[in-house]
Amino acid sequence: MSTEETGAYLREMHQKRGYTLEMHGIMAAADLAWAKKYGDFIEATYTGQRLLDRKTKELLQIVVEAALRADVDQIRAHVRVALQEGATPQEILEALEAVIMPMGALAFRRGLQAWAAETSFNPIDMSGEGPTSPPPLGEE
């Protein structure tokens, strides 16, 4: 397979999914025929329209990846696509909140970090040095 064909496939993948990861480039460069079969599987189970719409599938991706403690940047990619597909920042946050018990606080934290970074949420500065820092204990 040519480099040109691999590049075209990766551009098409990015257009359909809304993102590409480093692993996609490696897979396509190493074995484009297999990567295309994998892409067909992803289309059938994830990006293709069936009963669940893409927004719902992205919410599921976000909470599952948070539960599995995926890399924050990977979770952010799905937060970004969910927003593009019409999810509100509050819906994404609620999806993460709804599964905190079964997935645990550590996984929730990773999902929350991805959500805050992608939605430009400005958290309270907990260092005690910034303008949004909480007041010292006893001075509320």
Please give the residue ranges for each predicted region:
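Acidic, glycine/proline-rich low-complexity segments that act as flexible tails and inter-domain linkers
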Residues: 1-56, 108-140
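Short acidic alpha-helix initiation/capping motifs at coil-to-helix transition points
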Residues: 33-40, 69-75, 103
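A generic structural signal for short
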Residues: 66-68, 136
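A broadly conserved amphipathic alpha-helix scaffold signal in soluble, globular proteins
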Residues: 80, 97, 113-116
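Substrate/cofactor-recognition hotspot
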Residues: 98, 103-106
